[in-house]
């Protein structure tokens, strides 16, 4: 089994614990005074106490996308449910849930938000999951 591992900087471990654990529903694994492991939908996400980094932006299908960012490709129902959960928690979207690449092989629902440390996350769902790596026609 191959799992993805990602380590990101956060400037407040308690805020990260609330965001990733309580809001996004990621179970917590090991931790210390300077880092916390989370089960990010079957992958290992580690938040390390560190200073904030700069965010840059790139254009994608008319949107200004924050870079760097990471996230998850979900099924459509799970994507909609997570969007509702984020709204219910009173968090602001950086980019509201919407569909991009409409009518193309890469059609997808997407939304972006920032964690409390300013890390950008994207959650998306492919209209046709088999087209995740399809080239645009």
Describe the residue ranges of each PLM region.
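N-terminal beta-strand motif that seeds the catalytic metal site of vicinal oxygen chelate
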Residues: 1-14, 70, 74, 125-137
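Short glycine-enriched loop/turn motifs at secondary-structure junctions
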Residues: 1-2, 63-67, 104-105
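Core segments of cupin and vicinal oxygen chelate
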Residues: 9-52
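Short, conserved charged micro-motifs
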Residues: 15-16, 77-82
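Short beta-strand micro-motifs in enzyme catalytic cores
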Residues: 34-36, 68, 107-111
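A short local loop/turn or secondary-structure capping micro-motif enriched for an aromatic residue
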Residues: 46-47, 53-57, 129-132
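Helix-adjacent hinge/juxtasegments
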Residues: 59-75
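Vicinal oxygen chelate
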Residues: 83-84, 89-137
């Amino acid at each position: 089994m191959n799992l993805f591992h990602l380590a990101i900087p956060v400037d407040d471990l308690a805020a990260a614990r609330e965001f990733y654990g309580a809001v996004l529903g990621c179970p917590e694994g090991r931790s210390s005074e300077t880092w916390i492991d989370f089960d990010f939908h079957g992958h290992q996400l580690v938040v390390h106490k560190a200073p904030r980094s700069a965010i840059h932006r790139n254009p994608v299908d008319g949107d200004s996308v924050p870079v760097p960012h990471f996230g998850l490709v979900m099924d459509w129902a799970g994507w909609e449910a997570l969007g509702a959960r984020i709204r219910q928690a009173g968090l602001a979207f950086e980019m509201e849930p919407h569909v991009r690449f409409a009518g193309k092989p890469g059609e997808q629902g997407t939304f972006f938000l920032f964690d409390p440390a300013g890390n950008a996350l994207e959650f998306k769902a492919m209209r046709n999951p088999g087209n995740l790596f399809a080239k645009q026609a």
